[in-house]
């Protein structure tokens, strides 16, 4: 299995629109693309990323198919209008918490 790890900070003043996008567009559409969401963390204190999220696929080919899908590219571009310090990486799933 492979895991998509995403981290970002929500831009100040964008919180309401960001939450609306996250709940009404990003999460449902990513699930429809075939990504099984596994993690969603909100960091309130410290120097780390404000948001950490993850999702898995059965194999690398499925992950690559999702990430090359035009719908994913549109979602990612829209997410970038609400966030700073965006980071995306794909790793092999270890079963524990991954950064």
For every predicted segment, state its role.
Residues 2-8:
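Active-site-flanking beta-strand signature of metal-NTP-handling nucleotidyl enzymes
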Residues 45-49:
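Short acidic/glycine-enriched loop/turn segments that link adjacent beta-strands
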Residues 9-21:
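Short, surface-exposed ligand-recognition loops at beta-strand->loop->(often short) alpha-helix junctions
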Residues 40-43:
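Short, solvent-exposed loop/turn elements at beta->coil junctions and helix N-caps
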Residues 20-38, 56-91:
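An amphipathic, aromatic/His-enriched active-site/gating alpha helix that lines ligand/cofactor pockets
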Residues 91-99:
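Short, low-order "capping/linker" segments at domain edges
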Residues 14, 61-63, 96:
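Residue-level signal for secondary-structure boundary sites
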